[in-house]
Amino acid sequence: TSGYVGDGRKPIYAIRPGGKGTINLKKGAVDKSIAWRQPKAAPYNPSTLVYKDLLYVLYDFGFFACFDAKTGAEVYGKVRVRERERTPFTSSPWAYGDKVFCLSEDGDCFVYKAGRKHELLRVNKLDELCMATPGMARGSLFIRTASRLYRISE
């Protein structure tokens, strides 16, 4: 997890490989180890996801955003996952087959088309509390809910 409180002021930094010594992250500082920064982009619980050169950010209270992973440029800003309703997220998003998946604490799995356009494809319902990030192993996806463990494979 990011370790940041979701107060809208926590940054995301992209650090270049091979950086050495003290990396200066102070506002306005210039450090060649920092590729780019987004000053207000960090979630609290979910980790960010880089997939096909895009950085996807899922925020704890139901917003989803996308940035160019190489430059930090905003592709699309915070979009509410569910219109007019707060949707809590603890688990981190994952990607597979040109899709990005976001599993809410309510047990709803939001399936987005991966890419530069915000496009919700479907919502799959588990109808049970989900707090853990799904695991992947040996060609299967494992989803743990409050009372069940699902294994999904082709």
Regions found by a protein language model. Give the residues of each.
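Noncatalytic, solvent-exposed loop/strand surfaces
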Residues: 1-154
